[in-house]
Design a protein with these regions (language model features):
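Short hydrophobic/aromatic beta-strand micro-patches
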Residues: 134-136
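Short helix-loop-helix/strand-helix junction enriched in hydrophobic and basic residues
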Residues: 112-120
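Catalytic core of pol beta-like nucleotidyltransferases
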Residues: 1-110, 122-128, 138-204
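Acidic Asp/Glu-based divalent-cation binding sites
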Residues: 130-132
């Protein structure tokens, strides 16, 4: 972890809850007001996060914090957070390391990002849960071939694997709707963290 524990928690909360209020951030991060303000000022001055203030007269009534995905610093930091999430996922699901390694080795290079979503992403899976995988592509790919590769790669995995294949453009168009909102909120990026950050950049 490249940040102090309290700062990392603040970053994670802002990334997963864009627009989070200062009071909620302090409560969920379990830090003092002084610590939170110190960490936030550092992250703001580094252009890693951004804020919006609501004023009442000359007083600041509400402070909302967002990941700053328009800055290089923000992109790099939040892609590292995605990488950390992936490492934590594989520490808890060692039986998926091999299948994903084989899958990534053999899939079309037109696939820019691979994400886990659903119960496995929230660590709420049971023995009956499907492993939901989203593939985002930028150019035409052979979807049937991809599904066969998924079957081959996960042949030793004892649970159902449910691949979902989307074009990057379609994902962007629907990013604020239904299942897409859920995927944005809870996911593990297996491939293409920086590409994914760039995808959602215009929605920060």
């Amino acid at each position: 972890m490249i940040f102090p524990k309290s700062e990392y928690k603040i970053l994670e909360l802002i990334y997963e809850n864009p627009g989070i209020r200062l009071s909620e951030l302090i409560k969920k991060a379990k830090v003092s007001v002084a610590t939170a303000k110190q960490r936030l000022e550092h992250l703001l001055s580094s252009e890693i996060i951004a804020e919006k203030r609501i004023f009442g007269g000359k007083r600041t009534l509400i402070r909302n914090f967002f990941p700053n995905l328009r800055s290089e610093e923000g992109k790099n930091v939040f892609s590292l957070i995605e990488s950390e999430k992936k490492q934590n996922f594989f520490r808890k699901n060692k039986n998926l390391i091999g299948p994903f390694r084989q899958l990534l080795k053999n899939i079309d290079n037109g696939i820019k990002a691979v994400l886990i979503f659903g119960s496995f992403a929230t660590q709420s899976q049971t023995k009956e849960s499907d492993l939901d995988i989203l593939f985002l592509f930028t150019k035409k790919i052979d979807i049937e071939q991809l599904k066969k590769e998924v079957e081959r790669s996960f042949i030793t995995f004892n649970q159902e694997v449910s691949p979902r294949v989307e074009s990057l453009n379609n994902f962007k168009k629907n990013i604020n709707k239904g299942i897409y909102e859920t995927i944005i909120k809870n996911h593990i990026i297996i491939k293409g963290a920086l590409d994914y950050i760039k995808i959602i950049e215009s929605f920060d």
